[in-house]
Design a protein with these regions (language model features):
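Non-transmembrane "mature" sequence context
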Residues: 1-112
């Protein structure tokens, strides 16, 4: 039985071209757990659900300012405005607002 959070994992994967390892890295879940979410066998909860919701918000914004196929590249790149941290790692640490601020700059400029 699918839940909203499990459906969100599939949505993020589809629109943002993120892999199972990317979703696992950002949410702090293991890859087996993420695959279970994608098969609607389990549902994210607690911190995993929070990280997934944050990732979803960011991915939905990212696809408006860059090609969707570039999203996974950008999420794995060291970003100078994040002190050369990678967005996936910043999200995993619960600091998605840092990524959101960088993204706001991209939104203001129109594109990457």
């Amino acid at each position: 039985m699918a839940t909203s959070f499990a459906s969100e994992a599939a949505h993020i994967r589809e629109i943002g071209h993120l892999s199972v390892p990317d979703l696992a890295r950002a949410t702090g879940a293991n890859e087996t757990t993420v695959r279970a979410w994608l098969r609607d066998e389990r549902s994210p909860s607690g911190g995993h659900a929070e990280r997934l919701a944050e990732l979803s918000s960011l991915v939905e914004r990212l696809v408006r300012v860059m090609e969707p196929a570039y999203v996974p590249v950008w999420m794995r790149k060291p970003i100078p405005l994040l002190d050369d941290d990678k967005p996936l790692d910043v999200i995993a640490a619960g600091e998605y607002r840092r990524v959101s601020k960088v993204l706001a700059g991209l939104e203001a400029s129109g594109a990457v």
